[in-house]
């Protein structure tokens, strides 16, 4: 009976992974269909930039919501079976999609404006303090790798 929580948690993580893989495959298939359409017709369908941006943001939000909800369910389940907190189970890393968004922004500007930080916080569903900390830590980590060793 004591193996049940670990088994259920493992299965929930597998479901989360399958969802992410399926989502990525669907996005790739959509891109392939658009490319094929563009080859056959000669161009992509005309969609205004605002509509395209809105749709992309909504799709991203839905994907993130599902992944976050699965992650929350996993955490909630683990908390139920680990009420004393004896075992450290909290991940200290952001999910991959958040890290990728922050990395892309970092490549553009290592010192983003407050507006950009607020935008990232909204997209990633993090606080601006978490965004600030991530950029500070990232700058500190990359600073050590740029010039090689100094003696």
Swiss-Prot record:
One of its GO terms (molecular function) is DNA-binding transcription factor activity, RNA polymerase II-specific. Keywords: DNA-binding, Homeobox, Nucleus. GO terms for cellular component: nucleus. Disulfide bonds: none annotated. InterPro entries: HD, Homeobox_CS, Homeodomain-like_sf. SUPFAM superfamilies: Homeodomain-like. Its main location: nucleus. The keyword RNA-binding does not apply. It is found in: Nucleus. Residues 87-146 bind DNA. This is Homeobox protein HD-1. It comes from Encephalitozoon cuniculi (strain GB-M1). The gene is HD-1.
């Amino acid at each position: 009976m004591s193996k049940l929580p670990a088994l259920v948690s493992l299965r929930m993580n597998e479901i989360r992974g399958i969802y992410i893989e399926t989502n990525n495959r669907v996005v790739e298939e959509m891109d392939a269909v658009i490319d094929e359409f563009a080859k056959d017709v000669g161009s992509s369908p005309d969609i205004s930039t605002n509509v395209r941006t809105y749709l992309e943001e909504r799709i991203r939000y839905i994907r993130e919501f599902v992944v976050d909800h699965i992650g929350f369910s996993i955490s909630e389940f683990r908390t139920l079976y680990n009420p004393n907190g004896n075992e450290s189970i909290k991940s200290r890393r952001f999910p991959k999609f958040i890290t990728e968004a922050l990395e892309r922004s970092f490549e553009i500007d290592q010192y983003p404006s407050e507006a950009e930080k607020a935008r990232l916080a909204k997209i990633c569903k993090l606080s601006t303090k978490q965004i600030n900390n991530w950029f500070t830590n990232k700058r500190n980590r990359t600073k050590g790798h740029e010039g090689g060793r100094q003696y």
